[in-house]
């Protein structure tokens, strides 16, 4: 068993805070319209250049175990903000560092950490309510474009393309991002469908950074029943391996030996495969699988038609340009279905909607209709070099997630202004003791830090700007770091999604509370000698039929 290193009290927290400072210093330079780039060495290929806070945070691992524990806690705040709202990662990092550092000073001075936490929680909840009150719903294309522009670090073209994509497929529609084969940045609407079923095993993931399985030009097998044994499928699996194309299996379920065998062959490289459960239940499941079959020009393998798995060949499989599978959703893009057949299916569903008297059935039929006829908007991101394309694609994905958040919960004044003005409402809060009041004071001071950092990155004095803004009663009055002017942020189009600001604060406070209430830290003791790297097994399974193991 590995021996452990145990640290207690302020010494443990101080070392954790050193790790937090290292990560925060690397991330904070990216904040605001004049934030700087960060260059990250890759294990292979050219270095990555990014202005995305969470990408910077994810790249950092520290050698010292205790400092690394602090850095990883801070990283979790940035990652959570990105997962929930798609943006606000750098703001969450700056806030968490400020809250944790000030909180630790007070704990060292003898304040009760639990009361400090209670005071911080009271303050955060009050600010969240103020953010909700201040938020303004967005409807126009111009407002959507403004959010996309700001979330992509001032790239107006990205904002406009996202607004156009939402106009094409609706605000709730499916929008995906892919790399273009040329210099241009285009929006293309293609046949496609998304349903709420994810991969059956994380071992199907092909992109570990985003935890998604991406299948290019795959075959799609649609099977009505459960798959528990792959023996009847051997002929079709061998044919797919020979074609050197991926395979997506959609069935009622894939379980036991069948799932284990698919995973083993996926890991050995013999078969590029992923499996998902079919969407829906009962008769509705069968109807949705038939929709997918028509969309992809495949056949639903069902015993009703006397079809058996052992008799299936390549011609019975559907195809699509691309399939992306996350933990929760599957998106089929540009299925190769016949246009006339899809139109006929749409008309059939419309007639069923007209005939049904059940509101529930009508709702489910309308969902199917939207999936089949709505299409998928594809944002194709181009550039002069591979590094440029990847960096811009990251920003497009972040901006898209932030724009969806803005549509969901509305927008507030950007540039750190909403948090700054919200801090002024906290002076009226009533608490039980001076320690809780100190917790509120920590939050009041920390809420100034994002704006200070934006101003500092623009080359000005953050403290001076904060003082000037607090002299005004107008909650939308702020500092435009791009033009270096004091403006009405909403009128100037400098807006943030309310969900992004709210999530950044809540995640930051959560991490800071953990740090100031930590009294003991246990980590693995560093080893005196480096352990040899284990040899990677399973290489013999690569390629061709030799990779199959059924």
UniProtKB/Swiss-Prot annotation:
It catalyses: ATP + H2O + a folded polypeptide = ADP + phosphate + an unfolded polypeptide. GO terms for biological process: protein refolding. The keyword Zinc does not apply. Its main location: cytoplasm. GO terms for cellular component: cytoplasm. Its EC number is 5.6.1.7. Keywords: ATP-binding, Chaperone, Cytoplasm, Isomerase, Nucleotide-binding. The keyword Glycoprotein does not apply. It is found in: Cytoplasm. It holds the Pfam family Cpn60_TCP1. GO terms for molecular function: ATP binding; ATP-dependent protein folding chaperone; isomerase activity; unfolded protein binding. InterPro entries: Chaperonin_Cpn60_CS (IPR018370), Cpn60/GroEL (IPR001844), Cpn60/GroEL/TCP-1 (IPR002423), GroEL-like_apical_dom_sf (IPR027409), GROEL-like_equatorial_sf (IPR027413), TCP-1-like_intermed_sf (IPR027410). ATP binds at residues 30-33, 51, 87-91, 415, 496. NCBIfam families: GroEL (TIGR02348), PRK00013.1 (NF000592), PRK12849.1 (NF009487), PRK12850.1 (NF009488), PRK12851.1 (NF009489). Forms a cylinder of 14 subunits composed of two heptameric rings stacked back-to-back. Interacts with the co-chaperonin GroES. Together with its co-chaperonin GroES, plays an essential role in assisting protein folding. The GroEL-GroES system forms a nano-cage that allows encapsulation of the non-native substrate proteins and provides a physical environment optimized to promote and accelerate protein folding. Belongs to the chaperonin (HSP60) family. This is Chaperonin GroEL. It comes from Rickettsia typhi (strain ATCC VR-144 / Wilmington). The lineage of its organism: Bacteria, Pseudomonadati, Pseudomonadota, Alphaproteobacteria, Rickettsiales. The gene is groEL.
């Amino acid at each position: 068993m590995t021996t452990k290193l145990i640290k207690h009290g302020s010494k443990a927290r101080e070392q954790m805070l050193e790790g937090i400072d290292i990560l925060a210093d690397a991330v904070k330079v990216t904040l605001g319209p004049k934030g700087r780039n960060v260059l990250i060495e890759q294990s292979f290929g050219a270095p990555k250049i990014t202005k995305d806070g969470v990408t910077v945070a994810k790249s950092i691992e520290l050698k010292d175990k205790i400092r690394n524990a602090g850095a990883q806690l801070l990283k979790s705040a940035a990652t959570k903000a990105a997962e929930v709202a798609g943006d606000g990662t750098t703001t969450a990092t700056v806030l968490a560092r400020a809250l944790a550092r000030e909180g630790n000073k007070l704990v060292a001075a003898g304040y009760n950490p639990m009361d400090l936490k209670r005071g911080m929680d009271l303050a955060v909840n009050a600010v969240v309510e103020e953010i909700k009150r201040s938020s303004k719903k967005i409807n126009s294309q111009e407002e959507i474009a403004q959010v996309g522009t700001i979330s992509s670090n001032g790239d107006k073209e990205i904002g406009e393309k996202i607004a156009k994509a939402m106009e094409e497929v609706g605000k709730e529609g499916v929008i995906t991002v892919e790399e273009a084969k040329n210099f241009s940045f285009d929006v293309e609407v293609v046949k496609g469908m998304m349903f709420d079923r994810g991969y059956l095993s994380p071992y199907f993931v092909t992109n570990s950074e985003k935890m998604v399985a991406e299948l290019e030009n795959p075959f799609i097998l649609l099977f009505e029943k459960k798959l528990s044994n792959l023996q009847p499928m051997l002929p079709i699996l061998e044919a797919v391996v020979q074609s050197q194309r991926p395979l997506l299996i959609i069935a009622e379920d894939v379980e036991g030996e069948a799932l284990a065998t698919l995973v083993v062959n996926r890991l050995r490289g013999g078969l590029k495969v992923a499996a998902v459960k079919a969407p829906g239940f009962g008769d509705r499941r069968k109807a949705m699988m038939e929709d997918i079959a028509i969309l992809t020009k495949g056949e639903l393998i069902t015993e009703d038609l006397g079809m058996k798995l052992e008799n299936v060949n390549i011609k019975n499989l559907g195809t699509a340009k691309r399939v992306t599978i996350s933990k929760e959703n599957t998106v089929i893009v540009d299925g190769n279905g016949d246009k006339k057949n899809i139109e006929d299916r749409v008309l059939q569903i419309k007639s069923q909607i007209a005939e049904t008297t059940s509101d529930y059935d009508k709702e489910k039929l309308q969902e199917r209709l939207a999936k089949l006829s709505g299409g998928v908007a594809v944002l194709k991101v181009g550039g002069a070099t591979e590094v440029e394309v990847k960096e811009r694609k990251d920003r497009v994905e972040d901006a898209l997630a932030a724009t969806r958040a803005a549509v969901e919960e509305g927008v507030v004044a950007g540039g750190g202004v909403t948090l700054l003005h919200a801090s002024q409402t906290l002076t009226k809060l009533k608490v039980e003791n001076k320690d809780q009041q100190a917790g509120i004071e920590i939050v009041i001071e920390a809420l100034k830090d994002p704006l200070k950092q934006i101003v500092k990155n623009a080359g000005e004095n953050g403290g001076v700007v904060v003082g000037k803004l607090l002299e005004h009663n107008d909650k939308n009055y702020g500092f435009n770091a791009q033009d270096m002017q004091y403006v009405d942020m909403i009128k100037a189009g400098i807006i943030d999604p309310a969900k992004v600001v709210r999530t950044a604060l809540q995640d930051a406070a959560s991490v800071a509370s953990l740090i100031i209430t930590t009294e003991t830290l246990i980590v693995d003791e560093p080893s005196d000698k480096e352990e040899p790297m284990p040899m990677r097994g399973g290489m013999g399974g690569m390629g061709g039929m030799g990779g199959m193991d059924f």
